[in-house]
Design a protein with these regions (language model features):
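A short, flexible loop at the N-terminus of ABC-type nucleotide-binding domains that lies
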Residues: 1, 10-24, 74
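Helix-to-loop junction immediately C-terminal to a conserved catalytic motif
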Residues: 53
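H-loop/switch region of ABC-family ATPase nucleotide-binding domains
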Residues: 206-207
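The feature captures the beta-strand-to-loop junction immediately N-terminal to the Walker
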Residues: 38-40
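Conserved beta-strand-loop-alpha-helix hinge in the C-terminal portion
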Residues: 226-252
């Protein structure tokens, strides 16, 4: 489903601000894989997601999504393969439009249609049905402006919008980091439910080691732009956060000094 073949990226090469962000990242996801990604600030987690999304072009290597080489495709041409949810609940939705209109935009993405044609009764019924699966009562608030929703409600809606067209790959970039612990837990549970029910392939960046082990069937740990650990489902089931810390220190040769990674 996803083949990241030895990609590398250096920002501002030759300048005093030169930064090697990715160094020979090689990662392969089978269809249905749900991979959690963890590492300290600057480890390369979000940069890897951005590379897949086409936010920038890689210096070396290739990226293949569902058999299609997208390495040299611009971001907007890759969008049809991807669903994406960012850390900020304000991203991914239009605050001044209502819930129904936001879903219509997501549903018609790539179809060359706009809201000028109106929302059909069939589409409205489908949106209501999808919203009901969130368990937040949003199906009864479809005319409400999205800007009036809470952060958790908005992030749940963004997640639904990102998956409503069954993307080949779902990218989740710390999508619960801005939420309070209870709301974050609810959104993570919902995330796992949507991924499982729709048989999606997904990558989720997190700083929370407990969440990294609890969700998904693989956990990738990055350090200084490299993948240093790739933990399979069976290993995930039997290790704890403390074990993961030891594994990191052995693989990287250094201690974790980012407090955010010790949460949970």
């Amino acid at each position: 489903m996803l083949d990241i073949n030895h990609i590398a990226k250096t920002f501002n090469p030759g300048l005093i601000t030169e930064k090697r962000a990715l160094a020979d990242v090689d990662l392969h996801l089978a269809e249905g894989d749900f991979v959690t990604m963890i590492g300290g600030n600057g480890a390369g987690k979000s940069t890897t997601l951005n590379a897949v999304a086409g936010t920038f072009m890689v210096d070396r290597g290739s990226i293949v999504i569902d058999g299609v080489d997208v390495t040299h495709l611009p971001e907007y041409k890759r969008a049809k393969y991807l669903g994406r949810v960012f850390q900020d609940p304000m991203n991914g939705t239009a605050a001044t439009m209502n819930i129904e209109e936001n879903l219509a935009l997501a549903y018609r993405r790539g179809q060359g249609r706009t809201l000028h044609w109106g929302i059909t009764a069939k589409e409205r019924d489908e949106y209501r049905e999808k919203l009901a699966t969130l368990g937040l009562g949003l199906e009864d608030r479809m005319s409400s402006k999205v800007g009036l929703l809470s952060g958790g409600q908005r992030q749940a809606l963004t997640l639904l919008m990102a998956t409503i067209k069954q993307p080949k790959l779902l990218l989740l970039d710390e999508h619960t980091a801005a939420l309070d612990p209870k709301t974050a837990k609810n959104v993570l549970t919902l995330t796992q439910k949507i991924i499982a029910e729709n048989h999606l392939t997904a990558m989720m960046v997190t700083h929370n080691m407990k969440d990294a082990l609890e969700y998904g069937n693989r956990t990738i740990m990055m350090h200084e732009g490299k993948i240093i650990l790739d933990i399979d489902a069976e290993t995930k089931k039997r290790i704890r956060v403390e074990d993961l810390l030891v594994m990191f220190e052995k693989a990287s040769g250094s201690e974790i000094n980012n407090d955010r990674m010790l949460l949970g």
